[in-house]
Swiss-Prot record:
Homohexamer. This is RNA-binding protein Hfq. Residues 9-68 form the Sm domain. Keywords: RNA-binding, Stress response. The gene is hfq. It comes from Colwellia psychrerythraea (strain 34H / ATCC BAA-681). One of its GO terms (biological process) is regulation of translation, ncRNA-mediated.
């Protein structure tokens, strides 16, 4: 199942890391808005005026307010290959 999460986790992590506002549409048509505070295999914690725990199986669509860069952010251990 790790293969199926190879797109989902970096996408949600970029939303969380960059604090990108999102609209989450549930399968019943309800629209939730806020920022992804955290997530795991089963839920997303969405923060607005209150925090809401949203089960992933109830989510239809996640719409970011702007473009999302899922490329990994270079860390302090990454070295340039100028040599």
């Amino acid at each position: 199942m790790a293969k199926g999460q190879s797109l989902q986790d970096p996408f949600l992590n970029a939303l969380r890391r960059d604090r990108i506002p999102v609209a989450i549409y549930l399968v019943n048509g309800i629209k939730l808005q806020g920022q992804v505070e955290s997530f795991d295999q089963f839920v997303i914690l969405l923060k607005n005026t209150v925090s809401q725990m949203v089960y992933k199986h109830a989510i239809s669509t996640v719409v970011p307010s702007r473009a999302v860069n899922t490329a990994p952010v270079p860390g302090p251990d990454d070295q340039s290959s100028d040599a």
